Amino acid sequence: MNEKHPGPLVVEGKLTDAERMKLESNYLRGTIAEDLNDGLTGGFKGDNFLLIRFHGMYQQDDRDIRAERAEQKLEPRHAMLLRCRLPGGVITTKQWQAIDKFAGENTIYGSIRLTNRQTFQFHGILKKNVKPVHQMLHSVGLDALATANDMNRNVLCTSNPYESQLHAEAYEWAKKISEHLLPRTRAYAEIWLDQEKVATTDEEPILGQTYLPRKFKTTVVIPPQNDIDLHANDMNFVAIAENGKLVGFNLLVGGGLSIEHGNRKTYARTASEFGYLPLEHTLAVAEAVVTTQRDWGNRTDRKNAKTKYTLERVGVETFKAEVERRAGIKFEPIRPYEFTGRSDRIGWVKGIDDKWHLTLFIENGRILDYPGRPLKTGLLEIAKIHKGDFRITANQNLIIAGVPESEKAKIEKIAKESGLMNAVTPQRENSMACVSFPTCPLAMAEAERFLPSFIDNIDNLMAKHGVSDEHIVMRVTGCPNGCGRAMLAEVGLVGKAPGRYNLHLGGNRIGTRIPRMYKENITEPEILALLDELIGRWAKEREAGEGFGDFTVRAGIIRPVLDPARDLWD
């Protein structure tokens, strides 16, 4: 809808079953506690299957052995994924040692998976270990509350070790926003931490009794880095600094990448600029955006429920005016800001605080001991001696932050001996995939297991055309939900079926343009043949400093997506 003909503020009609479930759940309790004690199944039943998501977990099974187990008349091998709440990705070394121990002793896969939402996941937690994992997290000051389902998810914050003062201020705001928007129900504490039921009635002053219509994602961004990919998120606070000190934020609302194959009513969308606000209004504005989406978001169709669709339906100006009314402010004009990149600076960086920060490239964020590369053990050894903290980046990498000069050599020695500092190409550093098979129930094609060898092939093409020192932002996501953020890449592969992907081109290096589908449902050899030709052309015909995505648009290879709500599918 355009501004002149906005749609209805509230979509009338039959509510989705998810709305019934939330309403009947008694503020997210359901019968999870009873289900925990049912030893006849390894999973959670009925509504609890979905309710555990509000508690930071997804029920999954090992898809590699699903058919085999069905033949044996066995239920799937159910296990939970747990995602920690970790605003801004900062974790202490004491916390790291605790999660390392749990992953090694109590999960099927034994790994820690860093995610592009700056947190970690455990995969393969059997039902008997579900309560212990929450208690372990609580014992070191962590939790998994609201990291999935219809809540404000883990709040991202730019990992900028150089601008230490600015990062510290922005990180504090990421934590404050996260805390402010958390659910108030005591269900989490009662079920997992055995805290007593209190006689008071639950209330959710911000989220409401049926919570949000759909997932909601928030970031705090420090330009010129767009490492957190703001346009993938519902609500973004872009830090504006004066003399190195944070003074306020530009607010951008309504980004999001998830689509459904062939459903033209779904689209990826970049976020819209609302305006500038001084720091003191941050929490009021965050609450106003969330409550406006709570009240106006579409609860009759989950595929049309995210903030991006609400904005398109009611109009950006209408939504913005309502946020101003609820927050009791008027936005000032957007302050100037620009992005220059979104990759991590791998290796040592000295901050203005004179501390050193070591960014380690972790392919696909998967931390495990591999033959000859004991990544997990190496990080544990560093955690035992490091006095600073660890920071997970939105590129699935890890920063050993705040290293004094005197400790630098010791930490580097462990990192090198563990394979944590092995040299990789710029292309590999700028490539990313979601988890996909074997654990994700939504996966249509491989992603994490496909990426390493795929990038070997891309590296060969880059070398063939003399551009090995360059990179193309390349991402693979196993399904159109888009966790791998392929819909903000220069080259994005979106899983369609086993071994087949939709190839998207025409995004840019800084993540401000949605790529358009170039070819549908093609295999890896077909993708490589197309990219061989296009990388060759880019190498020969590009202008100085021109990225691959910008080149494909300028050369007329692909039409840029200018208004995704209307022209993404054309």
From Swiss-Prot:
Residues reported in the UniProt entry to bind siroheme: 483
Cofactor dependence: siroheme; [4Fe-4S] cluster
GO MF term (any one): 4 iron, 4 sulfur cluster binding
Enzyme class, UniProt record, top EC level: oxidoreductase
Listed pathway(s): Sulfur metabolism; hydrogen sulfide biosynthesis; hydrogen sulfide from sulfite (NADPH route): step 1/1
UniProt GO cellular component terms: sulfite reductase complex (NADPH)
Annotated cofactor note: Binds 1 siroheme per subunit. Binds 1 [4Fe-4S] cluster per subunit.
Catalysed reaction, written as an equation: hydrogen sulfide + 3 NADP(+) + 3 H2O = sulfite + 3 NADPH + 4 H(+)
Record bears the keyword Amino-acid biosynthesis: yes
EC number of the protein: 1.8.1.2
Binding annotation for [4Fe-4S] cluster: 434, 440, 479, 483
GO biological process terms held by the UniProt record: cysteine biosynthetic process; hydrogen sulfide biosynthetic process; sulfate assimilation
Superkingdom as given in the UniProt entry: Bacteria
Keywords: 4Fe-4S, Amino-acid biosynthesis, Cysteine biosynthesis, Heme, Iron, Iron-sulfur, Metal-binding, NADP, Oxidoreductase
Signal peptide interval: none
Stored Gene3D superfamilies: Sulfite Reductase Hemoprotein, domain 1 (3.30.413.10)
Known function: Component of the sulfite reductase complex that catalyzes the 6-electron reduction of sulfite to sulfide. This is one of several activities required for the biosynthesis of L-cysteine from sulfate.
Subunit-structure text: Alpha(8)-beta(8). The alpha component is a flavoprotein, the beta component is a hemoprotein.
Similarity comment text for this entry: Belongs to the nitrite and sulfite reductase 4Fe-4S domain family.
Name recorded for this polypeptide: Sulfite reductase [NADPH] hemoprotein beta-component
